[in-house]
């Protein structure tokens, strides 16, 4: 059998009626979930039970059930999808080196510096 949602209009006059309805319906085989809207006097039963069986059980406790609707149960809300992890960013381009490489050149073109020390005389005594 398939799971179905049954809505039944019942007479709720007091708290005793409320508990009698809940007890009668919970004894039915195949009932998964029961909710009772006291303001609108609507009993909602979800499960694989027969809706006529639910109405018959309510008649046995002196209720006048009216089946409002029979249909599939509401779909449970989908859990929110976890955020996708961000893709790793590609590494940044390497920075150019701080020193500048000179182009290669021939050894005959090397710059040579010559330093000379000239002092007035070769020997000094003080």
Curated annotation (Swiss-Prot):
Keyword Lipoprotein: yes
GO molecular function terms noted in the UniProt entry: metal ion binding
Sites where the protein binds a metal cation: 14, 17
Proregion span(s): 124-126
Domain spans labelled HMA: 3-69
Extent of Pro residues compositional bias: 71-80
Lineage: superkingdom: Eukaryota
Residue numbers carrying Cysteine methyl ester: 123
Keywords of the record: Lipoprotein, Metal-binding, Methylation, Prenylation
Inducing or repressing factors: Up-regulated by cadmium.
One Pfam family matching this protein: HMA
Disordered: region residues: 65-97
Sites of S-farnesyl cysteine lipidation: 123
Known function: Heavy-metal-binding protein.
Protein family membership: Belongs to the HIPP family.
Protein name per its UniProtKB record: Heavy metal-associated isoprenylated plant protein 43
Species this chain originates from: Arabidopsis thaliana
Gene: HIPP43
């Amino acid at each position: 059998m398939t799971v179905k949602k049954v809505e039944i209009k019942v007479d709720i006059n007091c708290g005793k009626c409320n508990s009698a309805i809940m007890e009668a319906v919970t004894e039915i085989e195949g009932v998964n979930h029961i909710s009772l809207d006291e303001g609108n006097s609507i009993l909602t039963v979800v499960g694989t039970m027969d809706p006529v069986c639910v109405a018959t059980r309510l008649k046995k406790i002196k209720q006048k059930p009216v089946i409002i609707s029979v249909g599939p149960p509401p779909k449970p809300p989908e859990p929110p999808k976890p955020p996708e992890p961000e893709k790793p960013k590609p590494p940044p381009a390497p920075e150019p080196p701080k020193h500048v490489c000179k182009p290669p050149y021939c050894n005959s073109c090397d710059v040579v510096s010559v330093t000379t020390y000239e002092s007035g005389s070769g020997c000094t005594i003080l």
